[in-house]
Amino acid sequence: MAAGGPGAGSAAPVSSTSSLPLAALNMRVRRRLSLFLNVRTQVAADWTALAEEMDFEYLEIRQLETHADPTGRLLDAWQGRPGASVGRLLELLTKLGRDDVLLELGPSIEEDCQKYILKQQQEEAEKPLQVAAVDSSVPRTAELAGITTLDDPLGHMPERFDAFICYCPSDIQFVQEMIRQLEQTNYRLKLCVSDRDVLPGTCVWSIASELIEKRCRRMVVVVSDDYLQSKECDFQTKFALSLSPGAHQKRLIPIKYKAMKKEFPSILRFITVCDYTNPCTKSWFWTRLAKALSLP
């Protein structure tokens, strides 16, 4: 599946990886795709042309236009449809004459595909030998399929995020402001907000573990007095810390967005805090947070 331009064949992923689901592409590649396709020009096909090739209807495309990152939303929506794959995406980009995209992103797409294959092989190798008929001690993989609004119900193409947001219901207004500042601006980050993105009907502990460990690159903790009383937030925080002891991978980012009467949680004191309450640094708050969440 080579592009038409000179040298494009070496940039596009090889056929052995192009049949992979779109979930193989990480957020970095998706954001760079958005940089190419979100721009409306007269000389190059943009995301709307891609949406039409993906068989999206007029009203669906108009709805996607309302998002700050229509290309990102398009990919999220398309990956749950039959026939969506890395290879099909490259075919459509070639058909639209976007050889520039293939040349620029081909190596990164190939790298993502190879990482996806390696991870699948590792997970398969680590599976314990168990008899399905009698094994009831661990949850089935299918139980964690279709847990978010844009998930493939069969679990083949799970929805992925830049960050999981750990918060209490009483802090939802600040979370909504976070959505406006990080998703609906040029940062174009994708946040996992339970009340918005998670479907009801599954064990909250299983969902949180799946999302934090496998679907989200980082976790933002909205710290408040109410947070200290939440067993769910306590579990999510400790689980995230267990995945990155000593915070060496910068996986967890605490946020203090209002004054607290109670003492700041001791398990988070060794991690640099984003302090929204400090008037001297408030103007830098969203930029610092966005850059922290955008790190590879």
From Swiss-Prot:
Main location (coarse class): cytoplasm
**Residues with PTM Phosphoserine:** S244
**What post-translational modification information does the record give?**
Ubiquitinated; undergoes 'Lys-63'-linked polyubiquitination. OTUD4 specifically hydrolyzes 'Lys-63'-linked polyubiquitinated MYD88. Deubiquitinated by USP3 that cleaves 'Lys-63'-linked ubiquitin chains leading to inhibition of MYD88-induced NF-kappa-B signaling.
* GO CC, any one term: nucleus
Signal peptide (residue range): none
Decide whether keyword Isomerase is in the record. Answer: no
Segments forming domain Death? 32-109
Task of the protein: Adapter protein involved in the Toll-like receptor and IL-1 receptor signaling pathway in the innate immune response. Acts via IRAK1, IRAK2, IRF7 and TRAF6, leading to NF-kappa-B activation, cytokine secretion and the inflammatory response. Increases IL-8 transcription. Involved in IL-18-mediated signaling pathway. Activates IRF1 resulting in its rapid migration into the nucleus to mediate an efficient induction of IFN-beta, NOS2/INOS, and IL12A genes.
- Give the protein's recorded name: Myeloid differentiation primary response protein MyD88
* Organism field: Gorilla gorilla gorilla (Western lowland gorilla)
Upper lineage: Eukaryota, Metazoa, Chordata, Craniata, Vertebrata
What gene does this protein come from?
MYD88
